[in-house]
């Protein structure tokens, strides 16, 4: 598995933000504003921590996936791409 799925999901998020399809969860949270999306990232962070301490591996994986999704939405609103993050991680590795 590679970072390809993250890139694909980010592109779907951008598409949803641009086209605003009815019934899209992405559109629903984006319409509530950046502060709302940032709060969702915070909520998902807490849920990820709780799952790591008190729940099974499958639940932890599910919460990490939720956190990554909400981070990607917030990144899209900030104009930050996964490539920006990959470059920063690579820079820190050196």
From Swiss-Prot:
Subcellular location: Cytoplasm
UniProt cross-references to InterPro entries, sorted A to Z: HisE, PRib-ATP_PPHydrolase-like
GO biological process: L-histidine biosynthetic process
Chief place where the protein resides: cytoplasm
Keyword set, alphabetical order: Amino-acid biosynthesis, ATP-binding, Cytoplasm, Histidine biosynthesis, Hydrolase, Nucleotide-binding
Keyword Hydrolase: yes
GO molecular function, a single term: phosphoribosyl-ATP diphosphatase activity
CDD domains: NTP-PPase_HisIE_like
SUPFAM superfamilies named in the record: all-alpha NTP pyrophosphatases
EC number per UniProt: 3.6.1.31
UniProt pathway: Amino-acid biosynthesis; L-histidine biosynthesis; L-histidine from 5-phospho-alpha-D-ribose 1-diphosphate: step 2/9
Catalytic activity: 1-(5-phospho-beta-D-ribosyl)-ATP + H2O = 1-(5-phospho-beta-D-ribosyl)-5'-AMP + diphosphate + H(+)
Any Gene Ontology CC annotation: cytoplasm
Similarity comment: Belongs to the PRA-PH family.
PANTHER family: HISTIDINE BIOSYNTHESIS BIFUNCTIONAL PROTEIN, HISTIDINE BIOSYNTHESIS BIFUNCTIONAL PROTEIN HIS7
Protein name: Phosphoribosyl-ATP pyrophosphatase
Source organism of the structure: Saccharolobus islandicus (strain M.16.27)
Gene: hisE
């Amino acid at each position: 598995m590679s970072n390809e799925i993250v890139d694909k999901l980010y592109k779907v998020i951008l598409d949803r933000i641009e086209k605003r399809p009815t019934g899209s969860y992405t559109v629903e949270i984006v319409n509530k504003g950046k502060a709302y999306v940032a709060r969702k990232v915070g909520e998902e962070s807490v849920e990820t921590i709780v799952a790591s301490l008190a729940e099974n591996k499958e639940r932890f994986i599910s919460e990490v996936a939720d956190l990554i999704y909400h981070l990607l939405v917030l990144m899209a609103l900030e104009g930050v791409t996964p490539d920006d993050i990959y470059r920063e991680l690579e820079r820190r590795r050196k």
